[in-house]
């Protein structure tokens, strides 16, 4: 089971990637209102046919070896660090998919240890999802 704190750190860290239409919402939650615009984790994208797709948007790690000044996950940033294994990401993705929360995964990462090492972990995650978990989602 993935601890809630690591999950929150890595979904909140992913909100800075603005490639999903619902990333970085500035709307505030109102008491008694429905929905949650402030929390990261689920983003929405659109398929070629115009259909809206819900995606789990998460970082594999926010623990970066580089110190790029523009990046909130840079090495010297004063943020809590977290990393998920490929297996943990797969279990999380499949669990959310089975509960009908998402249709796919939007996975990104800080450069953890080295660029090559990070890319191998990302590829391993995709391979596990498709082969071991037989995930056909987006």
Predicted features along the sequence, with ranges:
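Conserved, mostly hydrophobic/aromatic
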Residues: 55, 68, 107
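Short beta-strand/loop segments at the ligand-binding rim of alpha/beta enzyme cores
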Residues: 131-138
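Canonical Radical SAM [4Fe-4S] cluster-binding loop centered on the CxxxCxxC motif
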Residues: 58-87
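Conserved glycine-rich "GG(E/T)P / GGGxP" loop and the immediately following alpha-helix
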Residues: 105-124, 128
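Short, charged beta->alpha transition segments
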Residues: 57-58, 87-98
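Short Fe-S-cluster ligation motifs
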Residues: 94-108
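Short loop/turn motifs at secondary-structure junctions
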Residues: 6, 67, 101-103
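Flexible, acidic/Gly-rich N-terminal and inter-domain linker regions that tether
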Residues: 1-63
